[in-house]
């Protein structure tokens, strides 16, 4: 692991806050010694989520109206890897947090944010999501900003018309699918043409609803290259039951699932052709373009016979980090504090169907997602199994073949072999 580079300072935080008219009390930042330089400090803000680029442009404009010491340049088009390769990372990033971002943490290239008051406001169960992928010494390299919680989107009218209650056990889920099938309603609209939808939905929900995902991958890593059907932990040993159930659920899909993609699924679901859709909250806006008044809800996919086992799939839809190589860390911290002020972060999550990450965050109020709030509050959530699998393993292609063939055993054998191969080379 390379040593951490010293912080390169431009204007001090005290100078920036004073010039910005955003006092330390307002932003909760302590002062520090002054550094060289004066005038306006420009920082590059890396945020590429396409549906909220305009949203953050508006936030940046409001920040500029409130002060004149810091100018934020919104970079929404770059790629993370080339920036680090060229030694030109942004001053502040607010991105989806996944395994590809997490691989930078052990290298010590993100600055430690643990001394920021905002870090103390993060729910411990949410901050733990960061550590599940990677850690670096005793530091806080990434601050969560927004959680996207996912489950089964369902058409409330179709459930009511067919006398189906929201299932809370595996047997109830199967019974619901049988009822819809008998009534001529497609139980689950699937979009197997785009394999990411299989990984995010059927695979992640099936596995996450049945096992402790993080514990499984922790134990799998401990096995090293000694992974097989008979080892203490393996895909074949631990995932056999959830994958068998995944294959069962796939059979309740629309007959043309293999030729239908994400957009097709949103349109068909909006037209009322299916009762359930295994997608995240990002699908709501697309569905609303066709059926703005469609009454929808969401529930966690039940994979056991105990309702107490219900969990939501989550991902850190946005998380913040400041590179050590930034020459404007103090200014970046000021803007990050602004972004994490309750009036900004809470409004963002409310407007974008996200769940809050702070101890004082208000509960979600949109009726489409409120059913997941108790699970978020209780920490009954998991990051999808597919997100732990490196890109060097083409799991999405494997899953696409599995839902077509129904051969879950071959999938698990292949995953064990691929994982073993990577472990040998590591």
Q: What annotation goes with each model-predicted range?
A:
Residues 2-103, 107, 118-120, 258, ...:
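Conserved N-terminal structural module of periplasmic/extracytoplasmic solute-binding proteins
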Residues 110-115, 266, 271, 281-289, ...:
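Mature extracytoplasmic/periplasmic domains
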């Amino acid at each position: 692991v390379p040593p951490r580079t010293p912080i390169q300072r431009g204007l001090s935080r005290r100078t920036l806050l004073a010039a910005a008219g955003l006092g330390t009390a307002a932003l909760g930042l302590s002062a520090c010694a002054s550094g060289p330089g004066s005038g306006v400090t420009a920082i590059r803000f890396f945020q590429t989520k396409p549906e909220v680029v305009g949203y953050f442009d508006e936030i940046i404009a409001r920040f500029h109206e409130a002060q004149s010491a810091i100018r934020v340049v919104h970079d929404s088009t770059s790629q993370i890897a080339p920036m680090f390769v060229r030694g030109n990372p942004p001053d502040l990033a607010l991105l989806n947090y996944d395994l590809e971002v997490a691989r930078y943490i052990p290298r010590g290239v993100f600055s430690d944010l643990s001394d920021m008051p905002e870090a103390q406001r993060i729910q411990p169960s949410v901050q733990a999501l960061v550590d599940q992928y990677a850690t670096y010494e005793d530091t806080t390299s990434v601050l969560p900003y927004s959680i996207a919680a996912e489950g089964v989107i369902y058409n409330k009218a179709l459930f009511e018309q067919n006398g189906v209650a929201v299932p809370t056990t595996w047997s109830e889920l199967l019974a619901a699918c049988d009822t819809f099938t008998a009534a001529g309603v497609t139980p689950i609209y699937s979009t197997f043409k785009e394999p990411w939808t299989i990984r995010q939905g059927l695979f992640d929900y099936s596995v996450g609803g049945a096992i402790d995902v993080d514990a499984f991958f922790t134990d799998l890593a401990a096995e090293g290259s000694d992974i097989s059907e008979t080892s203490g932990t393996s895909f074949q040993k631990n995932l056999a039951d959830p994958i068998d159930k995944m294959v069962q659920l796939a059979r309740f899909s629309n007959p043309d699932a293999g030729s239908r993609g994400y957009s097709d699924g949103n349109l068909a679901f909006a037209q009322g052709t299916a009762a359930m859709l295994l997608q995240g909250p990002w699908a709501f806006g697309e569905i609303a373009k066709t059926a703005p008044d469609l009454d929808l809800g969401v529930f966690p996919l039940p994979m056991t016979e105990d309702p107490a086992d219900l969990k939501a799939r989550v991902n850190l839809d946005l998380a913040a980090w400041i590179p050590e190589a930034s020459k404007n860390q103090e200014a970046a911290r000021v803007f990050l504090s602004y972004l994490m002020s309750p009036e900004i972060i809470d409004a963002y999550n409310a407007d974008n169907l996200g769940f809050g990450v702070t101890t004082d965050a208000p509960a979600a109020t949109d009726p489409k997602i409120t059913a997941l709030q108790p699970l978020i509050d209780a920490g009954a959530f998991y990051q999808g199994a597919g997100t732990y699998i490196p890109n060097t393993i083409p799991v999405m292609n494997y899953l696409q073949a599995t839902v077509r063939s129904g051969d879950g055993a071959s999938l698990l054998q292949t995953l064990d072999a691929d994982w073993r191969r990577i472990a040998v080379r590591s």
